[in-house]
């Protein structure tokens, strides 16, 4: 039995074609584009606080934030709902068919669960909470400090970026298969190295941004600025 055939047995067959293609399309356009752009913007952390704040938290147009919600959050909600439905119908068969494609499919489902929790935490902690509670975007110093001195934060973000990079890179291959762009085993094998390259590039961008934040969090300037922020919020700090 081929790898493709064995993998197909693990994929739920009850999802309507239109719904399946729409779900995969919204995952790639615009979500994947936004993820790449978001990772790129966060690399501005290498250039300091002002560059990062401008790149990540400031919008050039007053309606840009609303457009971001429509273009990104709504497709994300749809893709999440679509993925949860597929997840409940997922029945792994890796013991019966321990092929490479089946292992990738299983890891994709596991990564999806991890990414779901990671995005929920990230959206709340880095976007919603500071705006709803403190009335503005989370300052660079606060985020960089957490990356440096709060081990659970850097651990969650390290694993979250890993899962996101894999889920997106492998998802692009699934998208190409679902839309008929990769119609043969040969074409899938030829695309496999590109999928790995995409994964490594995304992972490098994400972990690079985390490293820049981690490094900045150890500077005296960031620690002093973070102390001022916490003092303004009425929170006592250890540093």
Residue spans of the language-model regions?
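Membrane-embedded alpha-helical bundles that constitute the cytochrome b-like, heme-associated redox core
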Residues: 1-239
């Amino acid at each position: 039995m081929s790898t493709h055939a064995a993998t197909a047995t693990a994929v739920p067959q009850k999802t309507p074609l239109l719904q399946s293609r729409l779900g995969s399309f919204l995952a790639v356009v615009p979500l994947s584009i936004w993820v790449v752009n978001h990772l790129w913007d966060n690399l501005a952390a290498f250039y300091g606080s002002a560059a990062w704040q401008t790149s990540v938290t400031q919008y050039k147009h007053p309606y840009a934030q609303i457009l971001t919600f429509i273009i990104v959050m709504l497709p994300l909600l749809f893709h999440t709902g679509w993925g949860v439905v597929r997840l409940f119908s997922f029945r792994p068969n890796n013991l019966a068919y321990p092929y490479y494609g089946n292992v990738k499919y299983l890891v994709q489902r596991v990564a999806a669960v991890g990414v779901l929790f990671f995005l929920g935490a990230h959206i709340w902690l880095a976007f919603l909470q500071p705006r709803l509670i403190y009335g503005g975007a989370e300052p660079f110093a606060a985020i960089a400090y957490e990356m440096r001195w709060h081990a659970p934060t850097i651990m969650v973000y390290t694993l979250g970026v890993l899962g996101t990079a894999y889920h997106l890179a492998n998802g692009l291959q699934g998208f190409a298969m679902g839309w008929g762009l990769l119609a043969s085993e040969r074409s899938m094998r030829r695309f496999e190295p590109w999928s790995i390259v995409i994964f490594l590039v995304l992972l490098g961008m994400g972990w690079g941004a985390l490293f820049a934040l981690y490094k900045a969090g150890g500077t005296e300037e960031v620690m002093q600025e973070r102390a001022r922020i916490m003092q303004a919020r009425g929170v006592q700090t250890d540093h």
